[in-house]
Amino acid sequence: MSNTFQDLIMLLQNYWAQQGCTIIQPIDIAVGAGTSHPMTCLLALGPEPIATAYVQPSRRPTDGRYGNNPNRLQHYYQFQVILKPSPHNIQEIYLDSLKQIGLDPTLNDIRFVEDNWENQTLGAWGLGWEVWLNGMEVTQFTYFQQVGGLECQIVAGEITYGLERIAMHLQNVENVFDLRWNKGAFGYITYGDIFLQNEVEQSTYNFEYADANLLLNCFDFYEKEAQKLLALDKPLPLPAYECVLKAVHNFNMLEARKAISVIERQCYILRLRTLTKAVAQAYYISRQSLGFPMCKRHKKRR
């Protein structure tokens, strides 16, 4: 049973480690979702197997509300699981994970609602479901069909837990800032103790003070830098991908500042999709040139 936000994370990590997942660390770049981590987005391509789980801090500048909204944040946490090939009983495994954190599926209204997923900037989409817990969406299930505009050879199953929403239900609180993060040497530390000031200040920056001209220039810089890295005799797809992620964040900031029109928005999305596709192709070729090393290890274990 998870009594704190910290407990919730640790229980999920322990559960998925027991299922054979490698527990890794988040990518140290501002991203809008756990899917953007290269261990999900890039390794979903090709034949190499994956069983990975991690917490990913996520930023969506337009979702900020100056700390005045009880359940809407510009910075929040996801718990991400990626399994390739996707196990046939992935839903049962997921439901068992809910039991481990203190949610009994027989005592709660848990529904799988069809909701196919798409990330336009990453050129990715998949078939999937939202998981609703007593009327509130808490998880997204996705079976990847395409990433970076490339077809996935093997379908990967992705599970994305919304940690704050799950924790609010477990702790029976209506305001995210009232969540107990952990019980330390000086008593309970709340989510608000750690993040409320950050939400207020980051919302103020995102909506009011971020320099739109600087953001436009940064977008152009990271786009050119990614193109340069991909044009090398020996391309560097991973550094290029990091440039793409930085360009995506600048794009999200431009949206928060209302600095681009609807037509311009579509042009920026197309530029990002074009870049991501080039990165995906270069990454696939680089893994192929290495002989898809994770496939070799998988065969040895078998």
Curated annotation (Swiss-Prot):
Record keyword Magnesium present: no
Pfam families named in the record: tRNA-synt_2e
PROSITE patterns membership: AA_TRNA_LIGASE_II_GLYAB
An example Gene Ontology molecular-function term: ATP binding
Compartment annotation: Cytoplasm
Enzyme Commission (EC) number: 6.1.1.14
SUPFAM superfamilies: Class II aaRS and biotin synthetases
InterPro entries, sorted: aa-tRNA-synth_II/BPL/LPL (IPR045864), Gly-tRNA-synth_heterodimer (IPR006194), Gly-tRNA_ligase_asu (IPR002310)
EC supergroup of this enzyme: ligase
GO BP terms, alphabetized: glycyl-tRNA aminoacylation
Alphabetical keyword list: Aminoacyl-tRNA synthetase, ATP-binding, Cytoplasm, Ligase, Nucleotide-binding, Protein biosynthesis
GO CC annotations, alphabetized: cytosol
CDD domains xrefs: GlyRS_alpha_core (cd00733)
Superkingdom of origin: Bacteria
Catalytic activity: tRNA(Gly) + glycine + ATP = glycyl-tRNA(Gly) + AMP + diphosphate
The protein's assembly and partners: Tetramer of two alpha and two beta subunits.
Record-linked NCBIfam families: glyQ, PRK09348.1
Family of this protein: Belongs to the class-II aminoacyl-tRNA synthetase family.
Protein name per the record: Glycine--tRNA ligase alpha subunit
